[in-house]
């Protein structure tokens, strides 16, 4: 029988058990996310989307106000905060007590979300690279912190990404980040390999092929491949056509040790988790 490190994160003073994979539902309060179906701008849109995420079984809502798609428009911290306030006020009004993560690379934005709205997790696509104050802020706030690997920035990350040794470079990146965070006293660190961020389609599949090797860190692993170009560039079509491919890769990710799936399509992901867990539990007998 396969043994696996039991992983927990401290969420608002309660332990979230990751021995059963969790689903994180995406709430984009942006006008320019790469997947048009995920853009929520009006109050009614946000209310409907947050209700859908919860009703379909996600345990975390990931709210983001800064589009990280390739060549995304850069917005000011003030505009990012304005968009987030709108979404967080609605979440707290209609779904108090639900677990919320904020997708931001800015320390001041993270502080506002945690201190003013009770956000439980910080999800940083830049792992501190785009704001030198972020690591210190995370240590001060004492919340779980998701660090993602990205080569470059959202504005330039897909301009001919290159690696001499993809896996070695990604692992070294995480090793250095984790050590710095540990030195600052950060306890709950979650790794995100960063599919689609500064990587070609081939890079993404190489990374997926070695996903189980991230278990060496003995840290929770988040995978976000929902409707990304690594799917529709291979199969043809657009993000609208990429749900089946997403489900296939989510399944592979779970079999290779993913603890959290970050997705647009919550119901499909929850069902995927349920089936994979059933298979794993049946194999134990």
Where do the protein language model's features map onto the residues?
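N-terminal carbohydrate-binding accessory modules
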Residues: 1-19
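Active-site-adjacent loop and "lid" segments of alpha/beta metabolic enzymes
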Residues: 11-12, 18, 35-52, 68-93, ...
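N-terminal glycine-rich anion-binding loops that anchor highly charged ligand groups
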Residues: 18-26, 54-64
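Redox-cofactor binding/interface segments in oxidoreductases and associated redox assembly factors
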Residues: 25-28, 124
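Enzymes and membrane/adaptor proteins characterized by extended Gly/Ser/Thr/Asp/Glu-rich
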Residues: 31-33
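Conserved Motif II region of HX4D acyltransferases
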Residues: 194
């Amino acid at each position: 029988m396969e043994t696996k490190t039991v992983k927990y994160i401290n969420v608002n003073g309660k332990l979230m058990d990751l021995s059963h994979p969790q689903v994180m539902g995406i709430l984009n309060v942006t006008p320019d996310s790469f997947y048009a179906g995920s853009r929520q701008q009006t109050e009614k849109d946000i209310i409907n989307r947050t209700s859908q995420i919860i009703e379909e079984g996600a345990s975390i809502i990931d709210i983001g106000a800064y589009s990280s798609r390739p060549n995304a428009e850069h917005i000011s911290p003030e505009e990012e905060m304005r968009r987030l306030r709108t979404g967080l006020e609605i979440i707290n009004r209609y779904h108090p007590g639900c677990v919320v993560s904020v997708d931001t690379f800015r320390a001041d934005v993270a502080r506002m979300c945690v201190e003013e709205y009770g956000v439980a997790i910080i999800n940083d696509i830049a792992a501190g690279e785009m704001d030198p104050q972020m690591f210190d802020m995370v240590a001060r706030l004492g919340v779980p912190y998701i660090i993602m690997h990205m080569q470059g920035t959202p504005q330039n990350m897909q301009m001919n990404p290159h690696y001499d040794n993809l896996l070695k470079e990604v692992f070294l990146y995480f090793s250095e980040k984790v050590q710095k965070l540990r030195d600052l006293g950060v306890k709950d660190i979650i790794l995100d390999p960063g599919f689609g961020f500064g990587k070609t389609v081939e890079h993404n599949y190489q990374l997926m092929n070695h996903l189980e090797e991230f278990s060496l860190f003995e840290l929770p692993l988040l995978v976000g491949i929902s409707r990304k170009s690594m799917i529709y560039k291979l199969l043809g079509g657009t993000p609208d056509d990429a749900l089946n491919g997403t489900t296939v890769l989510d399944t592979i990710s779970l079999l290779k040790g993913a603890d959290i799936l970050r997705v647009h399509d919550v119901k499909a992901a929850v069902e995927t988790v349920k089936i994979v867990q059933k298979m794993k539990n049946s194999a134990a007998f």
